[in-house]
């Protein structure tokens, strides 16, 4: 009756382990936080194998009942041969060791979609389909997508929309419930409404969309953002899109006060996740690797040879809402759903601390909340007029927006 954003696989019980297989990408997206992309740092098989062996040998230290083996870049599918070898080895070793993750694992990818239809990628998908989660990033209309997601190369920059959209039908035929990720920066706010509706027209039923955490926002962006979301709300409700399609900007649970005595968890999973790069270094999250940071030094918590240094990891395990948020955020009447990224917090802080929450999206969150209230008020009024409000309430318990 109403399509809602679905929880991710094994949310809250899965360990996320990320292989940074390459720092190269075909694109040079203008809003990309990866400031140190390059063609040289590619993960070797020896480093990947050492990381796997360390993790599986220390099963007692990884007690989560499930695991998500995540592959990122750059563009991960540039290293499809290495990834295929890694995944084969993981399956063999988890089985051989009788590891508790063998019956509960996923291989996860976020890709630009450009070489999705290549023979090697398709062979890999066919072999591992039942354990795959693949998201293709398409930013909306061609105008919005090509505004930011451009091919790299001095004098060669051009939009990548046509190179991506051609693979959407194939992707959806293989993963019909897959969602896409959309990123909003200041320049493309005017295209939000038409872009979400365009993605719906491509039969992408779940659009996970967010504003960038960096301090890029201009005076008046929040008002324009709110207006775009209200216009989008009208289109979704008036044309019945809400029945089969979902946009993460509209969530019933956001925009409420938070009682930190009950809900004091960290929004971000940094420290509970684990990332490994081409040099074999471990990080609490990919955002703490050097290629993700504008002004701070990377935070390395170990390596594939010496293991994880618990003392370096400890500060991340103590993170929660109150230890890093200014009092204004804790007292905010619309605090729920206001997100943060631990890596951006660290990079934007005026000292080398992970306990200083960046608040660049404050006005944007409040604008989203106002539009979100408009959306749900209008939708509930429509449901009541049609006698369907009670049916909705009985089928859909209120869910919190998922932290990363």
Which sequence ranges carry the predicted segments?
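C-terminal accessory region of radical SAM enzymes
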Residues: 227-257, 287-339
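Long, K/E/R/D-enriched contiguous segments that form extended
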Residues: 193-261
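Radical SAM/AdoMet-radical enzyme domain recognition
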Residues: 56-57, 61-72, 79-211
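N-terminal [4Fe-4S]-dependent radical SAM core
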Residues: 1-18, 62
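Radical SAM enzyme core and accessory elements
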Residues: 1-6, 324-404
């Amino acid at each position: 009756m109403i399509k809602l954003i679905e929880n991710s696989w094994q949310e809250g019980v899965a360990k996320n382990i990320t292989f940074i297989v390459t720092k190269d990408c075909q694109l040079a997206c203008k809003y990309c936080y990866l400031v140190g992309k390059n063609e040289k740092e590619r993960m070797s098989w020896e480093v990947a194998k050492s990381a796997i062996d360390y993790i599986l040998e220390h099963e007692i230290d990884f007690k989560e009942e499930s695991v998500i083996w995540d592959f990122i870049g750059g563009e991960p599918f540039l290293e499809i041969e290495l990834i295929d070898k890694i995944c084969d080895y993981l399956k063999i070793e988890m089985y051989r060791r009788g590891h508790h993750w063998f019956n509960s694992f996923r291989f996860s990818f976020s890709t630009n979609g450009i070489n999705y239809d290549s023979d090697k990628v398709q062979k890999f998908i066919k072999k591992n389909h039942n354990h795959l989660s693949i998201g293709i990033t398409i930013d909306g209309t061609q105008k919005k997508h090509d505004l930011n997601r451009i091919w790299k190369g001095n004098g060669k920059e051009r939009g990548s929309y046509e190179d991506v959209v051609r693979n959407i039908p194939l992707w959806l035929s293989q993963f019909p419930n897959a969602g896409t990720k959309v990123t909003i920066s200041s320049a493309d706010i005017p295209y939000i409404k038409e872009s979400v509706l365009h993605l719906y027209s491509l039969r992408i039923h779940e659009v996970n969309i967010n504003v960038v955490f960096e301090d890029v926002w201009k005076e008046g962006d929040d008002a324009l953002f709110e207006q775009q979301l209200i216009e989008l709300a009208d289109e979704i409700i008036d044309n019945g899109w809400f029945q089969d399609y979902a946009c993460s900007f509209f969530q019933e649970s956001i925009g409420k006060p938070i009682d930190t005595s009950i809900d004091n968890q960290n929004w971000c999973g940094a420290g509970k996740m684990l990332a490994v790069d081409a040099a074999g270094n471990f990080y609490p999250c990919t955002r703490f690797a050097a290629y993700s940071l504008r002004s701070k030094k990377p935070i390395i918590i170990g390596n594939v040879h010496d293991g994880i240094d618990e003392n370096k990891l400890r500060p991340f395990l103590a993170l929660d809402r109150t230890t890093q948020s200014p009092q204004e955020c804790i007292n905010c009447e619309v605090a729920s759903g206001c997100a943060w990224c631990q890596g951006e917090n660290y990079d934007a802080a005026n000292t080398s601390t992970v306990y200083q929450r960046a608040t660049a999206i404050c006005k944007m969150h409040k604008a989203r909340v106002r539009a979100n209230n408009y959306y749900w008020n209008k939708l509930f009024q429509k449901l009541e007029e049609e006698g369907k409000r009670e049916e909705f309430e009985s089928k859909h318990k209120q869910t919190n927006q998922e932290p990363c």
